[in-house]
């Protein structure tokens, strides 16, 4: 009896291995856990065609919005680990969602098979145009002296813009009133109107207003300068040693997906990013394409864990919760 069970297990294992090597044999679904037409969706639609060509099967995009990206993420976490559904995740779905509630609907570290980071989105500290500081040291000095009367805005409680300012405030050592909005647009409008003092946003969103001289850019909040704002020094360069609030977007498969499928999808991602026209379109959006060594499943697995560790203390200290 035991020999029969062992033989059946071996047959099933061999069959699964063959299926993994043959993958994909039909259409693959990329789940984007945000509404169609948004900035993340735009990136997905840039990458899907060249990735489809690399895989030899069409990748279709399914937008499943809701719960800050958690609804679509949960769908993939519970999907069959056969490679035919994968998730476009990011800092929100795999970091903030885990820290802002006592009972996350899924585990970012345990419920997915990491595939590859495909873009890194630099962030920037922006202020109202008449804010009395032009550099980060000047901003810090003013904020420490005037924090009781200052306000910062965000796209909403628990949003990336909110969490980035939480991390920055913690690093500086200030306690400033948070004003949540329903989206970055209204927050920027109020900052331009002088009703709030600063916002920590992604460069791709803030860039038109910076170039139009409607707001001030004080510091890049990423490890390296942005290609599209190369003259703006990083927080690290301006004395906030080691500060890094980079956002990232990456692909994930369900936990238990065979390694050959994971590696194949990672290669398709990297192949797409190596195309000159893809890089150009992404960089024109203010996004950074990671080098090959940061496009691997192993790198992404470590990144998810390190990001959770980095953000845990500031989020806890802020008292922010979605419960």
Residue ranges and their predicted role:
Residues 90-91, 129, 203-204, 222, ...:
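Short secondary-structure boundary segments
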Residues 20-110, 149, 157, 173-202, ...:
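N-terminal (or domain-start) structured segment
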Residues 25-27, 259-323:
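An extracytoplasmic/periplasmic, membrane-proximal ligand-sensing/linker region
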Residues 78-84, 99-186, 235, 248-281:
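Hinge/capping helix and adjacent helix->loop/strand transition within the periplasmic-binding protein
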Residues 5-15:
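Bacterial N-terminal signal peptides
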Residues 107-117, 175-179, 197-198, 207-244, ...:
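Short beta-strand->loop
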